[in-house]
Amino acid sequence: MTLESMMACCLSDEVKESKRINAEIEKQLRRDKRDARRELKLLLLGTGESGKSTFIKQMRIIHGSGYSEEDKKGFTKLVYQNIFTAMQSMIRAMETLKILYKYEQNKANAVLIREVDVEKVMTFEQPYVSAIKTLWNDPGIQECYDRRREYQLSDSAKYYLSDVDRIATPGYLPTQQDVLRVRVPTTGIIEYPFDLENIIFRMVDVGGQRSERRKWIHCFENVTSIMFLVALSEYDQVLVESDNENRMEESKALFRTIITYPWFQNSSVILFLNKKDLLEDKILYSHLVDYFPEFDGPQRDAQAAREFILKMFVDLNPDSDKIIYSHFTCATDTENIRFVFAAVKDTILQLNLKEYNLV
């Protein structure tokens, strides 16, 4: 064999190998594209206590295996701790707001509850049960509860404190609603994947408090949709981290930052205006115009208030071509979330199919 023919032979082998590698790469790219279409990443964003973790719990109930008896048992201690935390917050606020107890015995009850180390609470027994019940029924504590926007109190405080008898029964097992209302601040990142119509939806919940947000950065790749939660009821509340900053202003600032991030240029944005039930209660006595003077709608009108808040957020979008999809929600209401997420899923799938030129 001549040198030329040997070289030609080697060359054709190299070309073959190169073609094979190229074909492999093309195949892998097609597979990646198909797999990317099969797994959609949904990033749940919003400030602290906007309802992100509750939303994930609902996905587990609606699209996952829900909560077994064993799972619910795991929440018992957390329900007890939420009760003590709520009452301790109100006892501290009684002093700060200089509100007096109506019944003398409640001074001693307050001392008893205040000295409890919440982290160590594992049970809910006497004398704590009657102390908390008696305190909750004190007109002073009720006045303090009505002024809760002036300090930090969990949204589920009234839900649990009004049901102390049931929760204190021996062998108590938390209900699904008890589980949905448990407040545990999210630290770090929680992922919840679920399968829908042969597509994996990977929902990622990141902590909303300021200290948690710096951990978000690596979640930003390949995000199909941003699901941004706003608590409608926060228009008159201040931040956990800073008691002279309005929570809704903080939420607006975060939303503005998120929708202008270059990472999210190709991600759809879905805005959940959450806690609509709390807004309906609160709007009757706390006027939106006192916190947002530009509001010129009627007072005590939840519909006008929520439309104004929606417009405030949508107006932050600088890109007229980018549609912001919005829904009013109540994250603790399973049927409401089932209905809303069905619409959201259709939106996400349609947009995703468009991106892959499949429609």
Swiss-Prot record:
GTP binds at residues 46-53, 180-183, 274-277, 331. Residues 270-277 are annotated as: G4 motif. Mg(2+) binds at residues 53, 186. Its main location: membrane. It catalyses: GTP + H2O = GDP + phosphate + H(+). It is a lipid-anchor. It is found in: Cell membrane; Cytoplasm. PROSITE patterns: G_ALPHA (PS51882). Residues 41-54 are annotated as: G1 motif. GO terms for cellular component: cytoplasm; heterotrimeric G-protein complex; plasma membrane. GO terms for molecular function: G protein-coupled receptor binding; G-protein beta/gamma-subunit complex binding; GTP binding; GTPase activity; metal ion binding. It comes from the Eukaryota. A lipid is attached at residues 9-10 (S-palmitoyl cysteine). Residues 38-359 form the G-alpha domain. Pfam families: G-alpha. Keywords: Cell membrane, Cytoplasm, GTP-binding, Hydrolase, Lipoprotein, Magnesium, Membrane, Metal-binding, Nucleotide-binding, Palmitate, Transducer. The keyword Metal-binding applies. Residues 329-334 are annotated as: G5 motif. GO terms for biological process: adenylate cyclase-modulating G protein-coupled receptor signaling pathway; phospholipase C-activating dopamine receptor signaling pathway; phospholipase C-activating G protein-coupled receptor signaling pathway. Residues 178-186 are annotated as: G2 motif. Residues 201-210 are annotated as: G3 motif. Guanine nucleotide-binding proteins (G proteins) function as transducers downstream of G protein-coupled receptors (GPCRs) in numerous signaling cascades. The alpha chain contains the guanine nucleotide binding site and alternates between an active, GTP-bound state and an inactive, GDP-bound state. Signaling by an activated GPCR promotes GDP release and GTP binding. The alpha subunit has a low GTPase activity that converts bound GTP to GDP, thereby terminating the signal. Both GDP release and GTP hydrolysis are modulated by numerous regulatory proteins. Belongs to the G-alpha family. G(q) subfamily. G proteins are composed of 3 units; alpha, beta and gamma. The alpha chain contains the guanine nucleotide binding site. This is Guanine nucleotide-binding protein subunit alpha-11.
